[in-house]
Swiss-Prot record:
The keyword Coiled coil does not apply. This is Nuclear factor of activated T-cells, cytoplasmic 3. It comes from the Eukaryota. Expressed in ventricular cardiomyocytes (at protein level). Expressed in thymocytes (at protein level). Expressed in thymus. Expressed in the lung. Expressed in the spleen. Expressed in the heart. Weakly expressed in lymph nodes. Residues 109-114 are annotated as: Calcineurin-binding. Pfam families: RHD_dimer, RHD_DNA_bind. It comes from Mus musculus (Mouse). Acts as a regulator of transcriptional activation. Binds to the TNFSF11/RANKL promoter region and promotes TNFSF11 transcription. Binding to the TNFSF11 promoter region is increased by high levels of Ca(2+) which induce NFATC3 expression and may lead to regulation of TNFSF11 expression in osteoblasts. Plays a role in promoting mesenteric arterial wall remodeling in response to the intermittent hypoxia-induced increase in EDN1 and ROCK signaling. Transmembrane segments: none annotated. GO terms for cellular component: cytoplasm; cytosol; nucleus. Induction: Induced by calcineurin in ventricular tissue. Induced by calcium in pre-osteoblasts and osteoblasts. The gene is Nfatc3.
Amino acid sequence: MTTANCGAHDELDFKLVFGEDGAPAPPPPGSRPADLEPDDCASIYIFNVDPPPSTLTTPLCLPHHGLPSHSSVLSPSFQLQSHKNYEGTCEIPESKYSPLGGPKPFECPSIQFTSISPNCQQELDAHEDDLQINDPEREFLERPSRDHLYLPLEPSYRESSLSPSPASSISSRSWFSDASSCESLSHIYDDVDSELNEAAARFTLGSPLTSPGGSPGGCPGEESWHQQYGSGHSLSPRQSPCHSPRSSITDENWLSPRPASGPSSRPTSPCGKRRHSSAEVCYAGSLSPHHSPVPSPGHSPRGSVTEDTWLTAPVHTGSGLSPAPFPFQYCVETDIPLKTRKTSEDQAAILPGKLEICSDDQGNLSPSRETSVDDGLGSQYPLKKDSSGDQFLSVPSPFTWSKPKPGHTPIFRTSSLPPLDWPLPTHFGQCELKIEVQPKTHHRAHYETEGSRGAVKASTGGHPVVKLLGYSEKPINLQMFIGTADDRYLRPHAFYQVHRITGKTVATASQEIIIASTKVLEIPLLPENNMSASIDCAGILKLRNSDIELRKGETDIGRKNTRVRLVFRVHIPQPSGKVLSLQIASIPVECSQRSAQELPHIEKYSINSCSVNGGHEMIVTGSNFLPESKIIFLEKGQDGGPHWEVEGKIIREKCQGAHIVLEVPPYHNPAVTSAVQVHFYLCNGKRKKSQSQRFTYTPVLMKQEQREDTDLPSVPSLPVPHSAQAQRPSSETGHPHDRAMSAPGGLLCQVQPAYTSMVASTHLPQLQCRDEGAGKEQHIATSSVMHQPFQVTPTSPIGSSYQSIQTSMYNGPTCLPVNPASSQEFDPVLFQQDAALSSLVNLGCQPLSPIPFHSSNSDATGHLLAHSPHSVQTPPHLQSMGYHCSNAGQTALSSPVADQITGQPSSHLQPITYCPSHPGSATAASPAASHPLASSPISGPSSPQLQPMPYQSPSSGTASSPSPTTRMHSGQHSTQAQSTGQGGLSVPSSLVCHSLCDPASFPPGGATVSIKPEPEDQEPNFATIGLQDITLDDVNEIIGRDMSQISVSQATEVMRDTPLPGPASPDLMTSHSAH
């Protein structure tokens, strides 16, 4: 912007500054170095400021002819230029004339403005090769192209007329100048020693071949400007003195002799001058004594010399890296507000574990943000300081509070004690650390600028008391620090620290130590005090929010995080030389006076769990409760957000003062099968909420009321069997064995869905039962009950769970007994089951009284209710009933039951075939479900014919079943036994109980069930039941294994232990396969 004539006796002529045109006169030939004052005549360039860069077509530098001696005239000029120029000339002074013979234009001082854009570095690299091919004779011929002002009219750039500050002049930014040394730069820093030591420590990491200053490239329009004038980049004000890959200075001209820089008139000019807030230019540290009106005197990350840039600035001139520092390297393309300056200590002293945090975005940086650290340091160390994001206070990445993983036992070496945020138990073995007296829920913390507000007090008066149980061998130290009280894991609080209280009233000795920048108070636990200590020496200190919030990685806000916990920790010596670490935290303590007066606080509540149906009354006690206070129940999802939120109904007429009575709302999912933990809090407004408390919803045991007589369908006068099928989904896939009513003379079919079984009944009293496991009360009115013992033989725990078939012998009307002492009732039967098993049960049958059975099962427990409103006469032949117990969508299957009771002896009993098929996997219960149950063997004539009832329950899928039990129960034995073939109805995914009988045996007027009888010797048709993958060989193997487990001796023992008033059958019937 200036043109000057550096005459020996003339002052600088700044005509072009005021828009005047004139050719500057050449300097006198006899001018000496002493005639040129450094402040009056520095190296001058001639610029044209008026036209924009796009309109510049010819350089305005005028060659100066008639220089008689370049040694006498240009030596001072070169000295001054090397002293003042930003980049300096590393060429040999002899090359001052162009190859054409004309003298080189005189290089005079100049003021140059440049703006930096993301393309600066790219454009600089693009023209690097142009300079590489230039020989020394042509370098000065092309260099006058830098004698032009490039001033892009960018909105963010300052007006040239408003910024005549010499801060951007080349003469004030020369790295040859003594003013750019670390000694002169340190004058602008408040902490000179720390900055220089930091720079020295970090710069030792650098490679001597890389440029610490970097060379952030040219400006957006600089490329066209260089193309028009064919200029090189050797005088670029942004180039580094070191030979970086982006620098134009080669090894030859760098090692060439260079005049020593003369004394500078501005040795103490600041180099860390702050950039203007609206400018995007990268001022490389002003060495001018005149400051711009905007910059702050304090060092700022917006200045070119910052604590970040010192990382790569050369400090030791003798290290072979650079003769002088070059601290300016960063160019930022966006405007940063002034308040977002980094106030924390230098983040370059990073731990090795944090090094890669800064280097993640290395490849995504724009060229203007890159420095030569990328070339050397960036490839050798993960430490990354070249990102301009580190210069400024950037938004921290989301910090995930992942809970630390503790070790298996809280035993540590004394040399590596656990960190303060490591979770530790409160007790281990016989040692326990406990807080006998909790602190008050509010304590006014004091600030750093005010006096102490005393020690933390207890709610009962006095001070908190901590005691160690289980260890009293020698004194140990109790460590105390201030921890967090939020929903996340316990860790040292960022905004509060413990404060040691001293005075005449303090009876407990203590001392302060620092552990990982957290103040910890050590209090002795003495055996003579029973390892107990009264914490009357600990206060709470509030740190400044601004100091903490601006720390890297800190995401908490001080004014919203005012609750703390007193955390106590001990390290108990162990015989092995290690220590046992225990830790306990107090209740939350509110440290803000405003929050303590405005925020509600829940101290206790009457209940902490209820069923998912809700409806229970809960009394909440606390402080700062208002009439409009609300209690909100919420459940958080996996993302931490509220998954379910509902307001509890507050019973206003019962509330008083600090007590609120509310009705617990029902849980949104009443079908849960396990306990669910939710939270609730009390709020007085949108921003006045208490701390969340935990609450547990427990699942409800489904209750199904038993039906009365009117619920049963009418029973005809004749024994008319009915086949009823009902299916109901159940929320549980529970144990089908667990609950079954003992029903002598019945075929039990217990499945998860509720089902209804009806049989013609005789004169029987009303029957009820109590299911202990389901919590249902069912009463049985019995006229006579006889408990018949039986023997349980465990077998293979493989296969589906099916209850077996039984028939008991009755003579006349009787009742169905049940063992009330058992919560899992079963009928005494010959019970054998296995995977895809075929259980063969031989049961003697006497006259049975048919009774209607109604069973409703709401939770897969099989509650049975039988009524006998009618007295009927049974025909000589009893038609067996077929039960279709569908269970298509269930995974837990139980065996069907058919309860057959006849009033008169049956002359002929048709074979009963039980063939439940279920292609899916079945889950069954534990063998403990087998208990001695009641039955009533009644004397009477034996049945002339009793055919064995084949029991087949193939299951195609793998089934988890209990160890099946073999039960054998018989009344009077029949004299003749026949074996029938296995036949079955094919109902996929259902449980089928098919009973075969002779339809002609029914009276003509009776209703019959359309069931097709199967031939007795017919082989089972596996294809019809969808079990194509099971072969007959598999079935034979299973049947053979089952048969081997049913021994005659066991059956004989069972029958011998059974009191039978009537004559016994001479033969014991055994089951066998039809194959």
